Amino acid sequence: KDNNDEIKLSSLIQPNFTFTYDLIECELNENSSLLDLEFFFSKNVNKYKLIISNAVELSILFPEKNTNVSEFIIAIESNNNYESLKTFVDQIQIDKFNNIAVCEFIINQNNGFNILEYNKSFNPDYTLIEILTCEYNQDFNYGSFQITIARFINYIKKLDIPYSLSYVQNKSNNGFIWINTFHDENYEKILIDNWIEGEEALEIKDEFIENASCIESNVYKSYQLF
């Protein structure tokens, strides 16, 4: 009974969400190239800035390891701006974006917050994002997971690496999206040297696995349009 009460109590704990997040998956048409995509956005970006309020960040994500890129994601961080996002989606279709790529224009407005922000200077032209799609294990939730998150953050802060972390709640299931952002192209070496082999790091990873299972992980190069 006590354990059930703990589960019920932990399920009541929710993060202090500060933004909404949408990932729009796209695929280039066979007769289109990345140059076409770049030209389209450079031609229209100022118009889209006017349509979408200042509280919105829009980035294009390309798979990191894939040299022949045909798939990409439009990532939009906003603040419950459903109407302006809908206006943007309508306008991008009016501008015949479908001549360049086919996209799943679904606006989910999943709630998110930044667990850790890296505020020191870094190369703004290089941002690498790892998106993990995760589900909580049975009897686990954000309330039980936040202890592990706090321990992870304390550890990462001591390493002082160019890294940010965001948490996005998945409305469609008992899950979340864990977004690692690396601000240095040598991120793999930095992680191996500072994080992967440490004893405390292994303990934190075990706690993570106890709370949740991540069913998909993808790494992208991110280019922020505005």
What are these regions (language model features)?
Residues K1-L202, E207-F226:
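Short S/T/G/P-rich N-terminal loop/turn motif that feeds into the first structured element of a domain
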